[in-house]
């Protein structure tokens, strides 16, 4: 009989592997638990049978689980190359428990501090947080190329209780700048499978990830300056915070001249010189720059390459908001701004290294 109770077919992270349980994929929407039990009953005695259903619509999700009394039933199912149920080919496999997902750390002695001003030093950070309790270590993450810190770092306190007190205040003021403080998390928590690493995004000039409020992604290489109470050596940090990776792509110039649609706008409309020059370009078939013709008076030139026209102050979201850009990024870039130059600020994607932490997370 179908059941609306919570379905135990999906194993909990700590469930041991049951060699008698099978995952059945590719089920027809019409397949019932009775039909599933009847089909697999020919291979052995079925102990448990489940068709997984949506808790709201009660519609089949297209897969289920079958547990045999002994492993011989599983072997017989696997020995048969093709299985068909309710006029649909199904895919039975041995079921394995889901791998445990890393859990967020709730008790820790280490905090992440982000949004520091460029003139803030590690001594400034340590001095500020000493008002909450004893600071064991403080560090800022540096770009080894420019030898300037990236605006964030970590502080380790003597006890977890001090961290709780610090994190009760989400934003702190250090050197006349509001900085963000949160509990540091292990790398496995902050960089799960399928993170945004490698996704191309463009950062507006003069803006960093803290201004955008974007989630943070682990940097491949940072070096850290640490407070003198303890030295850190080695690579591979135990903690990491997520920043998007950034790159600017420049569209190549087309090799052939780009001419307007001849039937729409006659070349003679632009004057004899323009018509002659365009005709000469067609004959030569070469040139380092494409020919472009101005649109008729009163029309608005289309924007190309995702950049604004030189006289349009439009919103930043239109400037950098490509169709495949994350909505989480574009939602923060909405203020009107004059069209920028092609120069960009310093890149966050340079060669960086990070030091290891010594509290068991690496």
Swiss-Prot record:
<dbReference type="GO" id="GO:0140693">
    <property type="term" value="F:molecular condensate scaffold activity"/>
</dbReference>
<dbReference type="InterPro" id="IPR035979">
    <property type="entry name" value="RBD_domain_sf"/>
</dbReference>
<keyword id="KW-0597">Phosphoprotein</keyword>
<dbReference type="InterPro" id="IPR000504">
    <property type="entry name" value="RRM_dom"/>
</dbReference>
<dbReference type="GO" id="GO:0005737">
    <property type="term" value="C:cytoplasm"/>
</dbReference>
<dbReference type="GO" id="GO:0042802">
    <property type="term" value="F:identical protein binding"/>
</dbReference>
<protein>
    <recommendedName>
        <fullName>RNA-binding protein Musashi homolog 1</fullName>
    </recommendedName>
</protein>
<keyword id="KW-0694">RNA-binding</keyword>
<dbReference type="Pfam" id="PF00076">
    <property type="entry name" value="RRM_1"/>
</dbReference>
<feature type="modified residue" description="N-acetylmethionine">
    <location>
        <position position="1"/>
    </location>
</feature>
<feature type="domain" description="RRM 1">
    <location>
        <begin position="20"/>
        <end position="110"/>
    </location>
</feature>
<dbReference type="InterPro" id="IPR012677">
    <property type="entry name" value="Nucleotide-bd_a/b_plait_sf"/>
</dbReference>
<dbReference type="GO" id="GO:0005829">
    <property type="term" value="C:cytosol"/>
</dbReference>
<dbReference type="GO" id="GO:0009725">
    <property type="term" value="P:response to hormone"/>
</dbReference>
<dbReference type="GO" id="GO:0008266">
    <property type="term" value="F:poly(U) RNA binding"/>
</dbReference>
<comment type="similarity">
    <text>Belongs to the Musashi family.</text>
</comment>
<dbReference type="GO" id="GO:0003727">
    <property type="term" value="F:single-stranded RNA binding"/>
</dbReference>
<comment type="function">
    <text>RNA binding protein that regulates the expression of target mRNAs at the translation level. Regulates expression of the NOTCH1 antagonist NUMB. Binds RNA containing the sequence 5'-GUUAGUUAGUUAGUU-3' and other sequences containing the pattern 5'-[GA]U(1-3)AGU-3'. May play a role in the proliferation and maintenance of stem cells in the central nervous system.</text>
</comment>
<dbReference type="GO" id="GO:0005634">
    <property type="term" value="C:nucleus"/>
</dbReference>
<feature type="domain" description="RRM 2">
    <location>
        <begin position="109"/>
        <end position="186"/>
    </location>
</feature>
<dbReference type="GO" id="GO:0042803">
    <property type="term" value="F:protein homodimerization activity"/>
</dbReference>
<keyword id="KW-0539">Nucleus</keyword>
<keyword id="KW-0963">Cytoplasm</keyword>
<keyword id="KW-0677">Repeat</keyword>
<dbReference type="GO" id="GO:0030855">
    <property type="term" value="P:epithelial cell differentiation"/>
</dbReference>
<dbReference type="InterPro" id="IPR034126">
    <property type="entry name" value="MSI_RRM2"/>
</dbReference>
<feature type="modified residue" description="Phosphoserine">
    <location>
        <position position="191"/>
    </location>
</feature>
<keyword id="KW-0007">Acetylation</keyword>
